[in-house]
Amino acid sequence: GGRFANLLGWDGWAAYKPYALLWVAVTAVVTFTLWSIVVRRRLALLAALATTLAGMLHGVDEPYAWPSAAWLAPVAVLAWQALRREEGTPRWTLACVGCYVGFAAITYTLHFGFAVLLVLVMAAVLGVFRVHSGRKVWPTVKQLFFRLLPIGLVSLAVALLVWTPYLVQTKLLLDSPKNAAMHYLPQEGATFPLPMTETNALGVLCMAGVVWLLLRFRRNEIAAALLVLVTAIYCWYVLSTLALVAKTTLLAFRLNVILDGALAAAGVFALLELIGFLRERIDARHALQVTTVALAVGLIGAVSMNQTAISEKLQPAKEQAYSDYYPTGDNAKGAKDPKEPGHWAPAVYAAVGQLTGKDPQENILLTTDYKLMSFKPYWGFQQETPHYANPLGEYDQRADEIKRWAAAKTPQQLLDMLNSSRFAPPNVFVLKHPDNASGQQSGQQGQSGDGGKLQLTLKGDAFPQSPNVRDYDVAFDPAVFQSPQFAQREVGPYTVIVRR
């Protein structure tokens, strides 16, 4: 996304919407291409359409994660066919599966881990069936190994394009730091997903898919592959539940969109087989009527899925989009409420620019009002939560450093702490008044008039509690900034402090 914005010369926040929509479109085209490899193009078009409708909101909300989710179902079918084939498998098939696994590794690590497990499970299932049918163990293992080897090599080559610096820094993961990313268990992750029980068009389509998978998996390769995929997702949920014993999860709910797409595609195949069955059993004079009814029902279902997604599931995001403030200090409705911190964003940006005399990308900010960071390319000293922090960023150590700075009693003591920090220290502090004095006018010089301390709100990992983060305040004595080494300005609820 960042490279897309750079290419267009846009700010990241402005490029997000077209970037997300572009990924949804590209993902749909590639999904169709992948399905067309394993089924006829007409079927592939319908399967890709069902997948897109089932997961479109995920694509808009998390465009970086949508491709690997949408493509997994057809890739799973390709992998199953490649592993199941008795004669030599075309190299391009193995390379295609490997490219997908590598792509998942550089875009969404959870999907990468699940895809690796899925391919290994498929190989194990096929190996067990072959040995059970009388094949010798060693030749079976050898054949499957040499099918898996190209997949692994290609995926490794693709993944290393992005992962090499991290692997070098962590000594091939032997020195990997603690990571809180897996410490999250929302309500949807605490229960098994049952999309086939929903009382809408997607629920009907998924139920048809479940029935088709159970009836056809013995005689249809596509049904067998998708059934293994669906079963693996539920097994991942079981493993994620067991992981709670170790006070972590496997973020199983992130696989729900894959489940929806796979069952929706299976539902398309089920309905098409049902239509074909009816056309063969009824009088030829009524065959056209059956096709017409099927097309009408399919169109109504597609429109229903689309409208449900836009009108219901997207409603909270739409409300937030209307209320969020732009970098101009107003929101989509034109509101300019001084009680809202976002109203003061332009004044904060102006204060930082005037006091530092530097471009945004030359400044390191210490603030926990992260919406200020959304519109300007400042460097941030601290990430918003430990769950989204780069493991190499040492979130906890940075939080301890901030608390150490807040304990300073004099300006010189604070300066000495900043100079001796093992991290690149911030040159800009954007702190909040304790009374959140949003009614003050920008441009006023000096410190907070009531002499109260200036605050930051930090977050810590609270898993397995819900919510999984805890907020705590860190307060700076305004006196530690009373030095010629600092310049400061009050802007609404903020005090902007710049180190000269």
Question: What spans do the regions from the language model cover?
Answer:
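Transmembrane catalytic cores of multi-pass membrane glycosyltransferases
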Residues: 58-68, 93, 103-228
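Short hydrophobic/aromatic helix or loop-helix immediately within or flanking a transmembrane segment
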Residues: 1-12
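Membrane-embedded helix bundles of polyisoprenyl
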Residues: 20-127
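Signature aromatic-anchored transmembrane alpha helix within multi-pass, membrane-resident enzymes
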Residues: 156, 275-316
